[in-house]
């Protein structure tokens, strides 16, 4: 008999019992998000989902994303309750821009050492995000990988599938000169630009724990969960049929995201003076001495979603969005793009 001690998975840094405890704690979270099309519960090898009734030519739409280095801020602040909503928002907001209704969501949670309380808090936030989006949390993967991550540090990824009627896909092809652009406000930086944000905080020596802006802690402003626009936008599409294009304003800001949904000959003219930029963006710009153009290329600057409709549908669209609890405004219009011109032109940029 060998004198070497008998090694277990736990000795290697993987606690199977902790993983099982987490699954038990999150079953209720998944149950609260259940849609009637989902077949079976958590724990199977694969999640089954029917196509919802009523679709003639259903097209499945998929997307995957993470939350970038906002996660590092969450870890530093030990604030894990809203990062799950961020994860869901980054995926479902991308799906809805083509008119898709999110059906189901899966998450991937990887860590060096599984902290069941932290993981359960994160997944509870994912569940809350799924409820806001009307999609079902059908499964996920929790990977405890000692040696890959420092201690209880973790990384997140999300994956979502939605469905849209083939004839109703929104792809920007109907956008024409004279169309109007409507904006929906963001809650803050959402889940993009956090490497720049963290660099600004570091270089400026900002004490994030003891800084307030307009009476609100800076930490809360930076960790505000990404808004989920799915339900108001699906209502807008359903009630008006007027949406020609939508852009989720993520990494790349207005400058890089609006062109993704425009025809090649179209230019979006955006009036930067049409909204009051949230104070957190002005604070970051000042502390980091960030160029105005760079601000709009990295951060959303207060705009989370841009919607294109015909000029004669503007009031109708604004009314529907307001009835859904949104605070929309007209942010610009569509012009013809001159040869070689950028597809987004920002008017009334402030001097910096």
From Swiss-Prot:
Its EC number is 6.3.3.1. One of its GO terms (molecular function) is phosphoribosylformylglycinamidine cyclo-ligase activity. It is found in: Cytoplasm. Keywords: ATP-binding, Cytoplasm, Ligase, Nucleotide-binding, Purine biosynthesis. GO terms for biological process: 'de novo' IMP biosynthetic process; adenine biosynthetic process. It comes from the Bacteria. The keyword Nucleotide-binding applies. Pathway: Purine metabolism; IMP biosynthesis via de novo pathway; 5-amino-1-(5-phospho-D-ribosyl)imidazole from N(2)-formyl-N(1)-(5-phospho-D-ribosyl)glycinamide: step 2/2. InterPro entries: PurM-like_C_dom (IPR010918), PurM-like_C_sf (IPR036676), PurM-like_N (IPR016188), PurM-like_N_sf (IPR036921), PurM_cligase (IPR004733). GO terms for cellular component: cytosol. It catalyses: 2-formamido-N(1)-(5-O-phospho-beta-D-ribosyl)acetamidine + ATP = 5-amino-1-(5-phospho-beta-D-ribosyl)imidazole + ADP + phosphate + H(+). HAMAP family: AIRS. Belongs to the AIR synthase family. This is Phosphoribosylformylglycinamidine cyclo-ligase.
């Amino acid at each position: 008999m060998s004198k070497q001690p008998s090694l277990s998975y736990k000795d290697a840094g993987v606690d199977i019992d902790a993983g099982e405890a987490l699954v038990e704690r999150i079953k209720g979270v998944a149950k609260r998000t259940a849609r009637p099309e989902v077949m079976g519960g958590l724990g199977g090898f694969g999640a089954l989902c029917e196509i919802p009734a009523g679709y003639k030519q259903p097209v499945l739409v998929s997307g995957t994303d993470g939350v970038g280095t906002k996660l590092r801020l969450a870890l530093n602040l030990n604030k894990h309750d809203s990062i799950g909503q961020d994860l869901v928002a980054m995926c479902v907001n991308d799906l809805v821009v083509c008119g898709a209704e999110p059906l189901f969501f899966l998450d991937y949670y990887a860590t060096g050492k599984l902290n069941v309380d932290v993981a359960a808090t994160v997944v509870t936030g994912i569940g809350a995000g799924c409820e806001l989006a009307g999609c079902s949390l059908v499964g996920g993967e929790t990977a405890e990988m000692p040696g890959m991550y420092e201690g209880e540090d973790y990384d997140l990824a999300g994956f979502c599938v939605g469905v849209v009627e083939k004839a109703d896909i929104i792809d920007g092809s109907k956008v024409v000169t004279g169309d109007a652009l409507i904006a929906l406000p963001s809650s803050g930086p959402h889940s993009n630009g956090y490497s720049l944000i963290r660099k600004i905080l570091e270089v400026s020596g900002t004490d994030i724990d003891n800084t307030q802006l307009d009476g609100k802690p800076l930490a809360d402003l930076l960790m505000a969960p990404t808004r989920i626009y799915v339900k108001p936008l699906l209502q807008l599409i359903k009630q008006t049929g007027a949406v020609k294009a939508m852009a989720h304003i993520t990494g790349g800001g207005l400058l890089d995201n609006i062109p993704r949904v425009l025809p090649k000959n179209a230019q979006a003219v955006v009036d930067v003076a049409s909204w009051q930029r949230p104070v957190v963006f002005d604070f970051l710009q000042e502390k980091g001495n960030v160029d105005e153009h760079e601000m709009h290329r990295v951060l959303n600057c207060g705009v989370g979603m841009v919607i294109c409709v015909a000029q004669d549908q503007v009031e109708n669209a604004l009314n529907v969005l307001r009835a859904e609890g949104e605070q929309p405004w007209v942010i610009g219009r569509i012009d013809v793009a001159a040869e070689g011109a950028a597809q987004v032109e920002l008017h009334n940029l402030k001097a910096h």
